[in-house]
Amino acid sequence: MKICVLGAGSIGGHVAVLLAESGHAVTVIARGTHLAAIRRSGLKLILDDGSEHTAPDMAATDDIRLAGPQDLVILAVKANQVEALVDDLPTLFHPETVLLPMQNGIPWWYFQRHGGALEGHCVRTVDPQARIMNAIAPQRIIGCVVYPAAAIIAPGVVRHIEGNRYPLGELDGATTERITRIADAFTAAGFKSPILPDIRAEIWLKLWGNLTFNPVSALTHSTLVDICQHPLTRDLASRMMAEAQAIANRLGIEFRVTIDKRIAGAEKVGKHKTSMLQDIEAGREPEIDALVGSVIELGRLTGVATPHIDTVYALVKLLKQTVAAENLCLRALTKDVMEGAMRATLPGGQSVVS
């Protein structure tokens, strides 16, 4: 297949390298020093077993419009980055192109091909103006849940931390020729990609962890095992999960594991920093609304109260605002320091910083 991976970051890099290695024609969309490194030396993946895999001739660009029509488009950017891509996405489509979104949280397409009274409902927290929903035909979409953990450790280099599960599901639950073909391609590349009859149930199972551990870790600067072993934060996680479970149940979703088992699974991961904590520490915009705000929205929609989720959401939104303000001040301070240093050394004290 011709495959385009939008966002060659940690997860995008993980799938791009192994799909290319298994014989598919893969193009990645990347930016900055990461793109420059991929163009120069290819995209390198270090798996959790220490083995190294490199796609030396990986096609890479920062312009979606140059990639051309694809058989499969893997959307491996954060939920809050999708809307900015919708104008250019159609340049990647031919009539049979499949779009495989890999976002965490409640996706924009959740109620598309859903059936029932909520068919076509727009999740405004993740798609405020319904631009994404209106731009992408739901018939193109196959759902996917991302379980692996990975990180970019240097430009052009992705380290896989753990996991290889990418469950797939048609939005209407059907087992089609196209989803079988994609699942087979993922399996041949070394991933575990079962075809699920209800991908939304799997989304909620993954979201249980993202909803709770991500914001709590960002607020406390703690790892998964820290949160799970501290009695108060473990109890908070349990209460947030119970609220989410009540919402999902109202939407017809049943969980195949208990809350205690889900927390125990997170505890076993150990000293792992969640992506939200990593974003906060790196000064990047954290992914909050798709993971937390969307659940509150669905709580309002279904009539389920979410007091614990509401409180954590308010705190982490303020944290985001505070970090953004601090980063702005830091950038201004850095510029002032640089200008002062340059004035001290240049004739006439003129500034060379713009």
Language model segments and positions:
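Rossmann-like NAD(P)(H) cofactor-binding subdomain of soluble oxidoreductases
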Residues: 53-56, 61-153
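Nucleotide donor/acceptor-binding cores
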Residues: 1, 71, 164
